[in-house]
């Protein structure tokens, strides 16, 4: 029955309600359960995956949401927390070319899957741009590695991440990256619109615009032009299934077809969720 919350197994067990069974909800639920929480996920739709849906037409399956598998080390890290290697759960195929750019009123461009060939492409379009791309990607890699080591896996519950010697040594660069928008950062180095488009599109992944995105995120060019773009066989539904499997193995409960309309609270703390039919 919609709105019926499972009875906790123990009064001493901490509980958590996760709203939404997209990538973030599934991963959060699995991690909370791993920490000992009794977790229930509430999802308005009748399937998990959120925006990572798929449709079938004439026997062909199509991803309706994400279609690029980037930052493989982040996925590797997550799966390893639960004792899995990524290759045990997913069959990933490197894409070459990584993707195809369709500039307005110009011929399409195939973007190579490695930095050396990408530099050759840049040079063929704009003399001098090949060497500039190599420098750009070197900076992107350094920034990416710094973010991975000190920022990606921290809760920022203390300023410790900002006080690490490596981070302090890069304060000047970080200040520049945080105060210069991505479009201006790229425009200072490249003139051709197509090259700028290749390097500023990551702002889309942040639901932003290059003019409003800090150039810190030029680190994203490391993920597609250096690490390369991968695609999971079976589509992104396969990635959803892998994380969903882990969450269930951790004991997470799922309430599909259940819409949360409000979070109740008292004294500054969340106390429950209000469902579309009744209040739990």
Language model features with spans:
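A short, basic/flexible loop-to-alpha-helix module at the beginning of a structural domain
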Residues: 3-14
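Residues forming anionic-ligand binding surfaces in small-molecule and nucleic-acid pockets
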Residues: 213-224
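Conserved small/polar residues in nucleotide/adenosyl-binding loops
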Residues: 278-280
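A short, glycine/Asx- and small/polar-enriched loop/turn
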Residues: 210-213, 264-271
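Helical element adjacent to the flavin cofactor pocket in flavoenzyme catalytic cores
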Residues: 222-262
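Generic, well-ordered alpha-helical scaffold segments in large soluble proteins
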Residues: 26, 35, 185-189, 198-201, ...
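N-terminal glycine-rich phosphate/pyrophosphate-binding loop and immediately adjacent elements
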Residues: 13-146
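Rossmann-like flavin
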Residues: 104-213
């Amino acid at each position: 029955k919609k709105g019926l919350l499972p009875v906790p197994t123990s009064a001493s067990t901490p509980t958590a309600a996760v709203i939404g069974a997209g990538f973030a909800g599934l991963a959060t639920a699995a991690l909370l359960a791993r920490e000992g929480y009794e977790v229930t996920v509430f999802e308005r739709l009748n399937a998990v995956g959120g925006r990572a849906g798929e449709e079938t037409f004439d026997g062909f399956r199509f991803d309706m949401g994400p279609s690029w598998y980037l930052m493989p080390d982040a996925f590797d890290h997550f799966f390893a927390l639960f004792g899995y290697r990524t290759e045990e759960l997913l069959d990933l195929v490197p894409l070459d070319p990584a993707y195809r750019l369709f500039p307005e009123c110009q011929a399409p461009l195939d973007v190579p899957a490695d930095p050396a060939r990408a530099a050759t492409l840049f040079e063929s379009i704009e003399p001098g741009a090949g060497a500039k791309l190599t420098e750009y990607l070197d900076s992107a890699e350094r920034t990416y590695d710094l973010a991975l080591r000190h920022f990606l896996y921290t809760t920022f519950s203390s300023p410790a991440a900002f006080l690490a010697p490596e981070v302090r040594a890069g304060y000047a660069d970080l200040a520049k990256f945080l105060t210069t928008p991505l479009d201006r950062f790229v425009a200072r180095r490249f003139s051709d619109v197509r090259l700028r488009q290749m390097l500023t599109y990551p702002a889309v992944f942040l639901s932003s615009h290059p003019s409003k995105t800090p150039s810190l995120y030029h680190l994203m060019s490391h993920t597609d032009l250096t690490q390369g773009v991968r695609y999971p066989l079976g589509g992104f539904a396969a990635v959803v299934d892998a994380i969903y499997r882990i969450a269930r193995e951790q004991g997470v409960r799922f309430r599909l077809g259940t819409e949360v309309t409000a979070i109740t609270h008292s004294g500054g703390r969340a106390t429950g969720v209000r469902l579309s039919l009744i209040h739990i």
